[in-house]
Amino acid sequence: MMGSYETVVMADAIAYVNGDGTLPDKPVMLTFDDGYYNNLLYALPLLEQYDMRAVLSPVGSYTDRFTDTPDPNPNYGHLTWEELAALQTSGRFEIQNHSYDMHGLSDRRGSSRKKGESESAYARAFCDDTERMQQLLSLHGIEATTYTYPYGAISDGSGAFLREMGFAASLSCYERISVLVRGEPASLFCLGRFNRPAKYTTAEFMRHMLGD
């Protein structure tokens, strides 16, 4: 990879922190959210061409909808459950949890707590939705270890809920380089990510990410 960066996925990061694995000298993680069909159409061939891997976090309700009524349109279509399972099996994509149906911007921003919502009501809503997605992923042979916050909207308490449900990590939308620390599982939560707007070239994006 350009500049000797090597792609890793969440399994690599988790193994490193737990003392069960190593990371390359210059690790980088490619992440794709929502589960768009164009990840299969365009990204998979490129990952194969350049011998890379990536993390894909689909929204379960979108996957259900397009499984019931497939529409392989690269502009707006989403992947089916069968396609997600095939991507996981390919070894190029690692599938994670992006909520079942908490990807909205109405009274609740993503999976965050609504204004005036009690702590217990929020815990129930968040955990029920997350567990529903976990069960669907598992039904299709996918065991997600990481929660990818919709819109990066994070509320107090959600991290504890994720740990109680057995998650080992979470991805935020905070634009920062993450530091993983061996023996410190907390360093796997709210990992930073840099959004790549279409208007930037790869060179411009890398300069922004590295602070050059």
Regions picked out by a protein language model, each given a short descriptive name:
Residues 3-92:
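Active-site beta->alpha N-cap acidic-glycine motif
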Residues 60-62, 99-101, 153:
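Active-site-proximal loop/turn and secondary-structure-junction residues that shape catalytic pockets
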Residues 84, 93-102:
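Aromatic-lined glycan-binding groove of carbohydrate-active enzymes
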